[in-house]
Amino acid sequence: MMAQRVGSKRMKKAPTKKDKVGLREVAAAANVSVATASRVLSGNTRVDRDIQKIVLEQAKKLGIDPAQRNKTKTLAFVLSNRAMLHAFHSRILSGAEAHCTANGWDMVFLSFNYSPHVPSTELHLPRVLQRHDVIRAVILAGTNSENLIKLLDHKGIAFVVLGNNVVGDQQDLKNNDVVFADDIQGGKDATRYLISLGHRHIWFVGNTRLPWFARCFEGYRRAMEEHGLVARQSNTDSEDETEIGYLGTKSLLARDEPVTAILAGNDPTAHGVYKALRDRNLKIPDDISVIGCDDTVGTWLSPALSTTREFPEQLGKQLVELVLKRIARPDQDPQCVMIPTEFIKRDSCGPPRASRTKTAGETLQRATIK
């Protein structure tokens, strides 16, 4: 079944007495938090037995049947703070939807933009996410922050999160179900490959304020330090990934420092790197080698881009797998799944020539004279 998009327009009906009775009313009647009431009604046995009894009694008095409440088989795929047509997240959605269908579940799709700076107590969830009779659990993709995660926890909404794109301290995820692509290892593998070719003047181009760039940079940094090399980066404060690559490379070349290879934080950034190098008449890989990360557009570029492949469809499958396990066993310990990356060797890398260990300005001058 195709994922359905939930838009802002919805038909309204006149509220009835039954409509007005929900989780908040049960929590108030039982004198517990909304999160506790949600956990009890979802079957979480870790809640104190006396509290469970009180919540279930109050739910019964209010006409709420937990068994009926838990019959819905619909998940919400929430794409936060990212473009709806983003290639990588579209493939995650595709993998998630396929696994839902294979397991007899439906999925709705929501685009949700929010500020990471708004306190969780002031953040307003889409109403459909708070309808436990409509949505059983949530898959968080896109770019997410601690405030939304805290809010879902507080409301007792079951969810799983794509960890790579969580802004802030990812230690905060230890109490939640989370799936990662191992892009730290991917950054490390890409850097090690460049080092194996003889490169020593390797720069990272990205925006480490964004978590997926920060994780790739961390792998790069570790590999450089393993070999006694200095990790250096050209950062651009933008969310346009191609622009990050273009402006970051222009800035790097203007510094007039030695550079023989560039690790771009992802493939769209590598596309921007290509454009900046060609504007300066620098050839890839003859003058400067380039590697990307994620394998989204690498085969479209010329020369074909060496990169670290992530597996977005597999990420989507694992996100669904974890959240279905959470639904089946609400009291299980938080789970973390790490999906390995794979280095893909193509045509954008080669060994450095002796002349390429000179400064970027000297390399540019040589390229211009040709």
Please identify what each model-predicted range represents:
Residues 58, 95-99, 151, 215-227, ...:
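Alpha-helical structural signal in soluble globular domains
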Residues 6, 232, 248-370:
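Flexible loop/turn connectors
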Residues 33, 65, 135-136, 199-202, ...:
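Short acidic/polar active-site loop segments enriched in Thr and Asp
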Residues 80-91, 109-121, 178-189, 204-250, ...:
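Hinge/beta->alpha junction and helix N-cap segments in small-molecule ligand-binding domains
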Residues 1-18, 74-192, 252-254, 258:
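Alpha-helical recognition/docking segments in bacterial nutrient-uptake
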Residues 33, 65, 101-106, 158, ...:
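Residue-level detector of anion-binding/catalytic polar loops
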Residues 1-71, 365-370:
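N-terminal helix-turn-helix DNA-binding module of bacterial transcription factors
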